[in-house]
């Protein structure tokens, strides 16, 4: 629960700072829509495919990853998981894509894609090497989509799904 509160507090502080600096905050707000949800579902599956292609060759013979232990020990209820996924998905995509990727676009597409993807991977390293590879694949797919469309809702929705689905599959 502290993660939800800390992300909300940090988001409010960051948005307040950006607003004081004259940044158009409205451009950072994802606009939910049915079409965006469908695209987000496609992004989810596309990221899963890219991640599978990247990670599978390295997965054989690997010891249990830290993320596997964390998932096995997690005892959150489904409503808490959904709230955490909504807050976390919006928090990460708004700042990594909506702000950082957009701010870096003037330095070229490679920088606008690479820096947010590497920042994303850096704070997911606790998941272990295979988890970091998954995060790299997912982050790159989301960044490519955003660079092409400048739409935030589909990556936010895909991220929310990415955070919820492992718990649903684990419990089924």
Predicted stretch roles:
Residues 17-21, 33-37, 112, 131-133:
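Residues in flexible loops and secondary-structure boundaries
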Residues 45, 61, 73-172:
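Transmembrane helix-loop-helix hairpins at the membrane interface
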Residues 1-22:
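Alpha-helical transmembrane segments in multi-pass membrane proteins
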Residues 16-17, 21, 49-57, 122, ...:
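Hydrophobic membrane-targeting alpha-helices
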Residues 19-26, 92-96:
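C-terminal ends of transmembrane helices
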Residues 3-6, 10, 41-44, 116:
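Hydrophobic alpha-helical transmembrane segments of polytopic
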């Amino acid at each position: 629960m502290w993660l939800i509160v800390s992300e909300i507090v940090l988001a409010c502080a960051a948005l307040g700072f950006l607003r004081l600096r004259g940044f158009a905050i409205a451009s950072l707000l994802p606009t939910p829509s049915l079409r965006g949800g469908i695209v987000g579902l496609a992004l989810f599956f596309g990221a899963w495919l890219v991640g599978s292609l990247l990670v599978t060759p390295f997965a054989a013979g690997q010891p249990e990853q830290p993320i596997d232990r964390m998932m096995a020990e997690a005892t959150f209820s489904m409503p808490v998981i959904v709230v955490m996924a909504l807050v976390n998905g919006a928090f990460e995509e708004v700042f990594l894509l909506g702000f950082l990727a957009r701010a870096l676009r003037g330095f070229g597409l490679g920088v606008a894609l690479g820096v947010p993807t590497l920042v994303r991977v850096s704070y997911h390293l606790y998941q272990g090497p295979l988890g970091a590879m998954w995060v790299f694949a997912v982050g790159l797919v989301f960044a490519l989509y955003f660079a092409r469309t400048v739409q935030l809702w589909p990556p936010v929705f895909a991220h929310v799904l990415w955070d919820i689905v492992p718990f649903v599959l684990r419990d089924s």
